[in-house]
Amino acid sequence: MSSKYPRSVRCCLPLWALTLEAALILLFFFFTYYDASLEDQKGLVASYQVCQDLTVMAVLGLGFFTSNLRRNSWSSVAFNLFLLALGVQWAILLDGFLSQFSPGKVVIKLFSIRLATRSTTSMLISMNAVLGKVNLAQLVVMELVELTVFGTMRIVIYNIFKIDYGMNMMHIHVFAAYFGLTVAWCLPKPLPKGTEDKYQTTTSPSLFAMLGTLFLWMFWPTFNSALLLNPIERKNAVFSTYYALAVSAVTAISVSSLAHPQRKINMTYMPNAGLAGGVAVGASCHVIHSPWIAMVLGLVAGLISFGGAKCLPVCFNRVLGIHESHSMHYTFGLPALLGEITYIVLMALRVFWASSNMIGFQVLLSTGTLSLAMAMSITSGLLTGLLLNLKIWKGPHVAKYFDDQAFWEFPHLAVGF
């Protein structure tokens, strides 16, 4: 017999979502208008192609990437689309209001959609840590809080540290990963015996997760270069991301076979380590001028991701009390920290080679922005986790974790689904 979505949530979720959408429509009506400037057709087409690539990554890539659980795949794909559609609207308004201090309407350009899509990606990453343990109403609340805090953080970095929007977006993986992990830490942790089958993977869901990985792998160079305005930096970002992804993919397959007693490849670790290179190189891809640096970074990121996914879950699940079924920490968190540290080292070396006495200031600046991103992600994640624990949201009971039957109608419910 299928589990029932709580009556209170069944009543309030449509009302809550439609009311929020109506409020967004009113805000767009009163405070926004389209950019009326005449752009050349070639530039417009190129800009739209970047938006299209980012949307494919978010919808297909991240949607299927989290569909590896046998009883939670429907929610993974559909909730991802819902949150992306809602989050882009909120992010466009938020970025417009925060970036202009004088009163006036927000001008919507293709770059605005590009920036909003990348900002919303932070929520789609964080969602991996809590997916299956919260309902859709809780995810909407989590999204509104995270996008607001993330947008505020970028404005603070822009105004205090004088780092433009393209550069301060490099903290997205660190912020998203540790925001999501902190929220997951606040949620009810014990999983009752007998429900382990719900968060086990099977062949078909794992294949869909690998399909999402392929979409992410193909379009990750666009993701890392989407907000860079300097043509040279954009070219460096594309090249560096490709080489880092290539090496991390080779590393994922090779190390997976090496670690298996019978030298077989384990599909479980492929999505994690295969993408780790793109995550790790994201912070420094625009300042890397030689392929070998990106390749070494991809190799180390792949090893860290594989080692973390294979050895650290016991520590996370039992010691820290964080049950993380989608390996988000090993795909985004640890590789992103490696990338941030690499960026700090590269910037320090650049200043040193230039015979400048500003090396200490540059290291302090880079370390300060990373520390701010970590502090704001953990603090806001803690507050969000406490907010999601309120009974008003009617979160799913631990016995109903990772179960699509709590949210979806199945025309013919098969035994053992």
Swiss-Prot record:
Q: Which UniProt keywords apply?
A: Membrane, Transmembrane, Transmembrane helix
* Claim: Transmembrane helix is one of the keywords in the record: yes
Q: Where is the signal peptide?
A: none
- GO molecular function terms here? ammonium channel activity
One GO cellular component term, please give it. plasma membrane
Q: Which Pfam families does this UniProt record tie to the protein?
A: Ammonium_transp (PF00909)
What kind of membrane protein is this, topologically?
Multi-pass membrane protein
* Protein name (Swiss-Prot/TrEMBL): RH-like protein
- From which organism does this entry originate? Macaca fascicularis
Lineage of the source organism?
Eukaryota, Metazoa, Chordata, Craniata, Vertebrata
